[in-house]
Swiss-Prot record:
Pfam families: Sec3-PIP2_bind (PF15277). CDD domains: PH-EXOC1_like (cd14682). This is Exocyst complex component 1-like. InterPro entries: Sec3-PIP2_bind. It comes from Homo sapiens.
Length: 172
């Protein structure tokens, strides 16, 4: 489903603006409409973060840009609590925007993409706080192009270790 939405977003919104869509996540912003937080790169190699409203008119899917920022203006991404599995995060521009991703995995996918594009295009000191750095940095053994599967894989690894440890007899 998400690949179809991504194709539709690219075709109807980003390609006409001569931008490449790198990542999008669904965010909880309104009860009536769906919203996406998108990361794109322009032909001039400017990284943009865009909030898009998705709605339907009849059978036609429509997308409307509601907010647009430059990655250059982003000061910090705050994941709220690194130790808990929650979808909440803040984007710190001149103003702080508190957002809720559809899932914790999509929050991490967004932060990973922003971090990767920052290193590729801006190389500025972008603060990414209250995230587990193992899942954010590409130099980690857990980094992957599977994005949302990354967090699930790590959780399964820890669960397997716990099962193995619980089955080991304790010496008396």
């Amino acid at each position: 489903m998400s690949s179809l939405v991504k194709e539709d977003l690219e075709k109807k919104l980003f390609k006409p603006l001569s931008q490449n869509l790198y990542e999008f996540i669904e965010i909880e912003f309104s009860v009536q409409d769906r919203y996406y937080l998108c990361v794109s790169v322009t032909k001039k190699e400017e990284v943009k973060i865009v909030m898009v409203k998705h709605y339907r008119i009849g059978l036609d899917e429509k997308y409307e840009v509601t907010k647009k920022w430059s990655l250059n203006d982003l000061q910090m991404i705050d994941g709220k609590e690194a130790d808990t599995d929650n979808p909440f995060f803040d984007l710190h521009f001149k103003k702080v925007y508190s957002l809720e991703a559809y899932s914790c995995a999509s929050k991490y996918a967004f932060a990973r993409t922003v971090n990767k594009l920052n290193h590729a295009y801006l190389k500025k000191d972008l603060q990414i706080v209250n995230f587990d750095s193992t899942y954010i940095n590409d130099d980690s053994i857990w980094s992957s192009n599977n994005k949302d599967c990354l967090v699930l894989m790590r959780i399964c690894f820890y669960a397997f270790n716990l099962v193995c440890l619980s089955l080991c007899p304790l010496p008396l």
